[in-house]
């Protein structure tokens, strides 16, 4: 989970009047529990960051839904898709990414910020799934405003595949990025 926390702290995430699943940034842990009284949360804390999570189905995919609090204030929320389904193929994970991407692009104007490590298939969208399976590309799309930062990621590292959609207060994301930079 530590690696997941680090990954998510590097990922700038969003804010609206209801920023993440009926919650607004700045709300407390108590308000989360009042909003979801029937939900049994898993709790983790590291370096002063409290994460409350539970499993759900989002977009038809088994998902860990997590709420990140700092000083009892909601700073970000994220979806970790199909985290423990190790048998799911790269092709199926890419299809999941595209399905979630369609939903996001219907609501927001997402910007493609993908990183190509080998651009052999970059101009052939019919081969993107293969390029991903080969480790040639990490898919990333973002949406930014003064109040909102959304980041949707599909990446492959060694034998692990990560698919995360995150929403965060942009000031918090900026702060976390600055702190991570000072660690190097």
For the regions a protein language model found, what residue spans apply to each?
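Short hydrophobic/aromatic-rich motifs at helix boundaries and adjacent loops
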Residues: 1-4, 72-73
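Generic detector of short alpha-helix boundary/capping microenvironments
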Residues: 5-6, 20, 60, 92
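A short, structure-level motif marking secondary-structure boundaries and short turns
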Residues: 15-18, 85-87
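A cross-family detector of function-defining hotspots
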Residues: 28-184
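Sec-dependent N-terminal signal peptides
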Residues: 3-16
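Cleaved targeting-peptide boundary
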Residues: 17-26
